[in-house]
């Protein structure tokens, strides 16, 4: 394992995080808040330690293979979360270190579950940092490093990209990893800016528009008011719902569109299944909740917003869905598990994995009836490699195992069945809100320290697609090979 290069990457992570904190520093000073000093101090120390690591551990061989690439990515996310929580904790705005760490992990992993009971009690700088965590974590800091550091951007470091990119397959839309990373961040920044403009046109306050744009782009879901998105107009809610849906699309689709390869972009099967799930879920829920709202338009508006929010794992809410019929809540839980498209900023199991498992199951049934037939699983007209199918199956088993163990530990808190189940589902899928005590108007403050630690693990595991984080606990991974 190239430990020297891992330390070098961690150093750059600290530098990037230290620089990112200065956005919160500037915000605090604009509003005349002394909390900016915490961001200034922690950010400066982070950057200093990062520079030291980069200078001392400059690698001779800038190549990471799969094991080291996964380890570097997992350690980067843990380190980012650890350093990122200090302003919350040192300022006293979140007095408990575990709570501050939980909130930061929730931000970076774009989960959006919170331990805060009064969001509006936070200073402007803290709110900005909380939302910007989503934007940093949405596309991923490792992808950012691949874009800005030439020595890391070679095709040989594809394992860094694979470790941080959501989904079973990392496409090769462009030949050079650095170019690919730069294109991803260019599209990411462009869509974020476009949403910000639409929100400003709708007369949303600039501070709110920045925070909501960051949270939507990262599909995170942190808001700046206790009322959440419900405090804004129908126009603003619709803009947010549309952009949540757009950020749940595989960014390779946007790359193909920009390259004017429209036929190739719109032939992607996962895209149409994703849209199909949104349309079907919206229609089913709207019909089911029609009697709760004064008009069909209101029912469709509420349904589309929440479906867009949950399938993309953003987690914004307009109302307390605990009051919705059981059928609607069941649909919500199903799309919580499905999640967004692979290669998007969304979380969940991913639409592509659902398609692959469905096709593999159909193939096995076909073989039972026609044993001599030779069939291969195909996606978009291309045969799927056996290793991808094997990885998808292993992912499912590991996912179920982590989910079951987490659910078992949370049951020790004596909270109700629905709350425990949906809390684990919402955190491992990086969605944020669940049902019961952790619904859209609830929070995670009542859980024990042990349960919060388990949920922190779930958030990190879910965002990193399980394997990179689990690798850290394998002793053989740290032995020389």
List PLM regions with ranges.
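Membrane-proximal intracellular helices of multi-pass ion channels
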Residues: 1-481
């Amino acid at each position: 394992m190239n430990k020297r290069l891992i330390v070098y990457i961690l150093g750059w992570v600290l530098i990037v995080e230290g620089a990112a904190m200065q956005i919160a520093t500037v915000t605090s000073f604009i509003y005349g808040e002394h909390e900016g000093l915490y961001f200034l101090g922690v950010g400066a120390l982070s950057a200093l330690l990062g520079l030291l690591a980069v200078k001392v551990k400059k690698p001779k061989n800038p190549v990471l293979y799969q094991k080291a690439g996964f380890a570097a990515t997992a350690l980067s996310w843990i380190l980012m979360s650890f350093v990122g929580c200090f302003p919350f904790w040192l300022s006293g705005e979140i007095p408990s270190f575990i709570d501050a760490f939980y909130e930061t992990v929730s931000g970076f992993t774009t989960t959006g579950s919170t331990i805060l009971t009064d969001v509006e009690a936070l200073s402007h700088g803290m709110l900005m940092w909380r939302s910007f965590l989503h934007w940093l974590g949405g596309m991923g800091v490792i992808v950012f490093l691949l874009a800005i550091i030439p020595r890391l951007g070679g095709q040989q470091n594809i394992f860094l990209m694979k470790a941080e990119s959501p989904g079973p397959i990392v496409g090769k839309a462009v030949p050079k990893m650095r170019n690919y990373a730069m294109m991803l961040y260019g599209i990411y920044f462009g869509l974020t800016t476009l949403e910000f403009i639409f929100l400003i046109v709708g007369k949303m306050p600039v501070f709110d528009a920045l925070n909501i744009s960051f949270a939507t782009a990262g599909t995170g879901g942190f808001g700046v008011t206790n009322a959440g998105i419900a405090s804004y107009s129908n126009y603003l809610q619709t803009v947010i719902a549309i952009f949540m849906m757009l950020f749940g699309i595989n960014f390779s689709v946007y790359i193909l569109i920009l390259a004017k390869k429209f036929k190739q972009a719109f032939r992607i099967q996962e895209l149409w299944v994703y849209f199909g799930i949104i349309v079907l879920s919206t229609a089913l829920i709207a019909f089911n909740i029609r009697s709760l709202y004064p008009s069909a338009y209101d029912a469709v508006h509420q349904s589309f917003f929440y479906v867009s929010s949950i399938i993309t794992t953003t987690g914004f809410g307009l109302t307390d869905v605990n009051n919705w019929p059981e059928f609607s809540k069941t649909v919500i839980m199903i799309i919580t598990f499905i999640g967004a498209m692979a290669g998007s900023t969304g979380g969940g199991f991913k639409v592509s994995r659902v398609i692959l498992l469905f096709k593999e199951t159909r193939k096995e049934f076909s073989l039972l009836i026609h044993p001599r037939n030779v069939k291969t699983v195909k996606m978009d007209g291309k045969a799927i490699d056996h290793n991808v199918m094997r990885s998808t199956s292993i992912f499912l088993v590991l996912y179920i195992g982590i989910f079951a163990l987490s659910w078992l530990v949370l049951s020790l808190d004596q909270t109700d069945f629905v709350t425990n189940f949906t809390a684990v589902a919402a955190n491992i899928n990086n969605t944020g809100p669940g049902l019961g005590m952790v619904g859209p108007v609830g929070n995670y403050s009542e859980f024990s320290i042990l349960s919060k630690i388990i949920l922190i693990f779930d958030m990190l595991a879910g965002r990193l697609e399980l394997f990179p984080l689990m690798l850290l606990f394998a002793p053989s991974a740290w032995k020389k090979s």
